[in-house]
UniProtKB/Swiss-Prot annotation:
It comes from Mus musculus (Mouse). Residues 168-361 form the MARVEL domain. One of its GO terms (cellular component) is membrane. Residues 1-134 are annotated as: Disordered. The keyword Lipid biosynthesis does not apply. This is MARVEL domain-containing protein 3. Residues 1-173, 269-275, 357-376 are cytoplasmic. Residues 1-95 have a biased composition (Basic and acidic residues). As a component of tight junctions, plays a role in paracellular ion conductivity. It is a multi-pass membrane protein. Widely expressed with highest levels in small intestine, colon, stomach and lung. Liver expresses only isoform 2. Keywords: Cell junction, Membrane, Tight junction, Transmembrane, Transmembrane helix. Residues 195-247, 297-335 are extracellular.
Length: 376
């Protein structure tokens, strides 16, 4: 029913917009409609401007809209500044060979509806950028030798021993050095058999006790003049072999000591700090391998001279007359064992020389490697 009095009743004022409510992302992108334009006095008088026609309410809505637009414009300006800073930093940054850096992906710009805390995050990003630019994430120069040394030992020594000092014992050079020491120890043991006893029943009965009665003067058949003659022949034959046996023991003992010293030097990283040590070790191994050949020749030559002497033949005849057949004039097991181990040592020392020279080349290559290849 229409009002006949001609007085128009005021319309109820709409509810105010909540300032904490998140606006729709496309709120400000609508095309302004004709009924929302300012200056339409007729529609404002009739109360047709999104509310009750109140001019104050329209001004408040326009002010709120302008503040949101200014906020979006400031956020977009900060995002463009951040992207420009990222591009300039990437153009100045040094290329890294080992994979992408942490700032490979560009920082996404802030959303138009994002909160105010984005400015603080961008500030933190700038501070992190300055700290990264100062250090540039490159390995310091003083740590490069340690990395090279670690690479040298890790490439060869990945095995049972994890100790940093004992890791060298798993390398090929260390195994050959231990084998050289073992072979020289066996040569020393075989040579000491002839050195410690004069041989014959005199040497057996010198142990005393039951050995004297079982093998010695009581039941040996040597009594009187034959016993004294057998003892003299044993001592003379021992003196004939003594120089050769002594030289073999001294030679093998010195080489065993040398092998242990090279093993200890490798465990203490002397070859890394002084590569010339590897050259000296390789030359010594080659010299020792070559010296074994004439050493074996003179060893068996002097033994053959001792076994072919008149003393050895008379001694053999005397023992055979008493029924003993183990005293013939020929090389025994200890002499043969020393010769076999010496022949094996020739090949081992030759291979050790090759490994030493290869180790020298490897150390020189690692020390001359440019630092850019070790940067992460």
């Amino acid at each position: 029913m229409k009002n006949t009095s001609g007085h128009r009743e005021p319309r109820t004022r709409p509810r105010e917009r909540d300032p904490d409510r998140r606006p729709h992302p496309d709120r400000d992108h609508h095309v302004e409609r004709s009924r929302d334009r300012g200056g339409d006095r007729h529609r404002e008088r009739n109360g047709d401007v999104r509310g009750n026609g109140d001019r104050r309410a329209g001004r408040e809505q326009r002010t709120d809209r302008d503040q949101r637009q200014d906020r979006h414009r400031d956020a977009g300006h900060r995002a463009s500044e951040q992207r420009a800073l990222e591009k300039s930093r990437q153009s100045r940054a040094r290329p890294e060979p080992w994979g992408p850096s942490w700032d490979a992906a560009p920082t996404p710009g802030p959303a138009p509806w994002g909160p105010r805390e984005l400015s603080q995050k961008h500030g933190l990003g700038r501070r992190g950028l300055e700290s990264e630019r100062a250090s540039e994430r490159y390995v310091p120069t003083y740590s490069v030798p340690a990395l090279q040394e670690e690479e040298y030992y890790q490439s060869e020594a990945e095995g049972l021993l994890d100790c940093h000092k004992c890791r060298y014992l798993c390398t090929g050079r260390a195994c050959w050095q231990m084998l050289k020491a073992l072979l020289n120890l066996l040569i020393l043991a075989c040579s000491s058999v002839s050195y410690n006893s004069t041989g014959g029943y005199t040497g057996i009965t010198s142990l005393g006790g039951i050995y004297y009665y079982q093998y010695g003067g009581a039941y040996s058949g040597f009594d009187g003049a034959d016993g004294e003659r057998a003892q003299q022949l044993d001592v003379q034959f021992y003196q004939l072999k003594l120089p050769t046996v002594t030289a073999a023991m001294a030679y093998s003992g010195a080489l065993m000591t040398f092998s242990c010293l090279t093993l200890l030097a490798g465990a203490l990283r002397v070859p890394w700090h002084c590569p010339l040590w590897l050259v000296i070790e390789g030359l010594m191994d080659a010299l020792i391998a070559g010296a074994y050949v004439p050493g074996l020749y003179f060893f068996f030559q002097h033994l053959s001279a001792a076994y072919s002497s008149d003393v050895c033949k008379e001694r053999e005849t005397l023992y055979q007359s008493k029924g003993y057949s183990g005293f013939n004039c020929g090389v025994h097991g200890g002499d043969i064992g020393a010769g076999v181990f010496a022949a094996m040592a020739i090949g081992v020392f030759a291979v050790g020389a090759v490994l030493a020279f290869r180790g020298y080349r490897k150390v020189k290559k690692l020390k001359e490697k440019p630092t850019e290849m070790l940067e992460f």
